Amino acid sequence: MSRPVPNPGILDIAPYTPGKSPVAEPGRKVFKLSANETPFGPSPHAIAAYKSAADHLEDYPEGTSRILREAIGKAYGLDPDRIICGAGSDEILNLLAHTYLAPGDEAISSQHGFLVYPIATLANGAKNVVAPEKNLTTDVDAMLAAVTPNTKLVWLANPNNPTGTYIPFDEVKRLRAGLPSHVVLVLDAAYADYVMKNDYELGIELVSTTENTVLTHTFSKVHGLAALRIGWMFGPANIVDAVNRIRGPFNVSVPAQLAAVAAIQDTGHVERSRAHTDKWRNTLAEELPKLGLTVTRSVCNFVLIHFPTTKGKTAAEADAFLTQRGLVLRALNNYGLPHALRMTIGTDEANALVLENLREFMGQP
C-alpha cells in the first residue's frame, strides 16, 4: 500500500532544536541562558498594552498590521508601505524562501549561520549551499565564490547567531555589489540592537537604494517579546508586493501588535538592556580566558565559549556540570561547534554564577 510522500527536500531537513528549557524544581533556582532571551523582560508599557486588548479578542486584526508598520516606520524613518510584519522574523524568512525558491534553485548561507536558513531553503525543494567562514565570521569572498547560475537567494545574519560575529557595512555592500542582480540578499538583523561598532549599519541605506535586498528584524531579543512572535521586514516595493501575496492576512495578533508598538517607543528600556549587555560582554571576554577558555568576541547578547577537548574539560561535560547546578547554556553540536557552548548574557546573578561554576569546573582557584 502506498502512502503520502513529502515534497523533495523535506526529509533532508534536520528538525530545529531550540535551546533547552529547564524544568523548575521545588527549592532550586534555575537560570535559562540557552535562548538569547533578555533578562529584563518586556517594557512595562508593552505588558500594559498587551493586556489592554483582552476585552476585544473576538475581533480579527487589521490585515496588514498597519499600526505596527507605522510605529516601526516612525522609529526607523521608513516608509510603512515597504514594511511587512510577521509571526516572528522566522515567518518572514520562510515567506521569502517560498516566494523566491523552487526545486533546482540554490540559496547560500555561511558555515555557522542560523539553522532556519537551510530549513526554509530545503522546504522549498532548493539546494542549501554553505560558504565557509574565516575565524567564525562570514567570508564575503567565499559567499561570492559559491554563486552559480542557480543561485536565487543569499542569507546573511549580521551579526550572526551563534558565533556573535559581524561584518562591517562596507563588506555587506561589497557582497551586494558582487551578487547578480536577480539574487535576493536577505539581511537578518535580529541582534542588531546590541551592536556598538562604528563600522556596523543595519542596512537600511542598501535596501532603500536597491530592488533586490531586504532587511529582517525581530521583537524577540532586546524588546523581550519572544513569546508573542513578532518580526518585520523592510524591502523594496517589488519584493514587498510579492511576499504580501502569500502572507496570511491575519498573521500578527492584535495583542502582539499593541505590545510591539509600546515596546518600540520605550527607548529607555532598550538602552538599559544594551548597557547591561555591553558591560557583561566585556567582563566575560576578560574573565573566561583566565580559566583556560577561549571566547569568540561577540557583539550580541551572548558569548561563544570554546572548551578544551581534554577529558574532564569538554563542552559536553561542562554543559552537564552547569545544568546540574541550574545553569542552562546552549550546546552547539547541530551548528558544527561541538566543543563550544553559547551563553546568553543573563542577570548579574546568573552571569556571576556561570563564572563561579566554570572556575570550579576548570579547576581554577
Swiss-Prot record:
Coiled coil: none annotated. Pfam families: Aminotran_1_2. GO terms for biological process: L-histidine biosynthetic process. It is an enzyme of class 2 (transferase). Its EC number is 2.6.1.9. InterPro entries: Aminotransferase_I/II_large, HisP_aminotrans, HistidinolP_aminotransfase, PyrdxlP-dep_Trfase, PyrdxlP-dep_Trfase_major, PyrdxlP-dep_Trfase_small. Gene3D superfamilies: Aspartate Aminotransferase, domain 1, Type I PLP-dependent aspartate aminotransferase-like (Major domain). Its cofactor is pyridoxal 5'-phosphate. Homodimer. Belongs to the class-II pyridoxal-phosphate-dependent aminotransferase family. Histidinol-phosphate aminotransferase subfamily. This is Histidinol-phosphate aminotransferase. It comes from Rhodopseudomonas palustris (strain TIE-1). The keyword Transferase applies. Residues 1-21 are annotated as: Disordered. It comes from the Bacteria. Pathway: Amino-acid biosynthesis; L-histidine biosynthesis; L-histidine from 5-phospho-alpha-D-ribose 1-diphosphate: step 7/9. The keyword Transferase applies. Keywords: Amino-acid biosynthesis, Aminotransferase, Histidine biosynthesis, Pyridoxal phosphate, Transferase.
